[in-house]
Amino acid sequence: AGFQHTCGITNSPTNSEPFGGALMCWGFNQKGQAKPPAGTFIQVSCGMFHSCALSIDEHIKCWGAQGIGASPEGEFLQVSCGNFHTCAILKDGHLKCWGKNYDNQVTDAPTDGNFVQVTSGKTHNCAIKKDGSLHCWGSNNRGEIQHPQGYQFIQVSASQWHHTCGITVDHELLCWGADGFGQCSDVPEGMQFTMVSTGRKYSCGILANGTSTCWGQKIQNYGMDQPPGNNTWAQISAGYMHNCGITNEGDSLCWGQDTGGQSS
């Protein structure tokens, strides 16, 4: 889920590949961000006005706003779109970032390797190494890169505003940075999490039992506080003011702001 568009991968492999699928995007398309390329893809990420996806042959294809959405050379493991920049992990474990560089979120990327996950936010990024160590860089206007010390992380998510959340190896959820709407201080306590996704000024997470909860900003009845129904979830993606998730039954559901059809 991005600013006002959403992309996903169908569960029907193309070109007789054993996994992966075709891309589908919906919502606002003023820069072409919701018009994906053809092919078989295994991962997709949405930014403000661009999107990028990892193909089954380990190449990245980006579309949308020119320059911001340029497709890089090389073979990759994962890609993450920020608001106006993108970071990805090369097959050798090194990081590559490109796009707008307002707060050195592109040029200050660590130059060593062994990274296994990267996340890009408004103007900051965080990445996890194989040993669970967390590294963040870029904007620190609200403390969004001042992560807690002494923890090993298994997953991290940088928001489209100024906060970050991560899950430790003990499945504890930690958040830091901007907290004007409780997006860090209202984190559910005493619960184990398997996944977290940060929106603009809110976050959503999947609990160990498969249920999900959201916390932080609740505005204009966009419904960002709780996912719909009594579902268990395989994945959730928080956007600017909307969310989409995949249930354990394989259904795709979206909720929140729908001004451009990004939730419908």
Language-model-detected regions and their locations in the chain:
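Short glycine/serine- and acidic-residue-enriched loop/turn motifs that recur at repeat junctions
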Residues: 24-38, 63-74, 84, 98-111, ...
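Acidic surface patches and DE-rich sequence motifs
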Residues: 10, 29, 55, 90, ...
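Intrinsically disordered, low-complexity repeat/linker tracts enriched for polar/charged residues
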Residues: 5, 33, 43, 50, ...
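Intrinsically disordered, low-complexity Ser/Thr- and acidic-rich flexible linkers and loops
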Residues: 13-20
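Thr-biased low-complexity repeat/linker tracts and other Thr-enriched repetitive architectures
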Residues: 43-45, 78-80, 91-94, 130
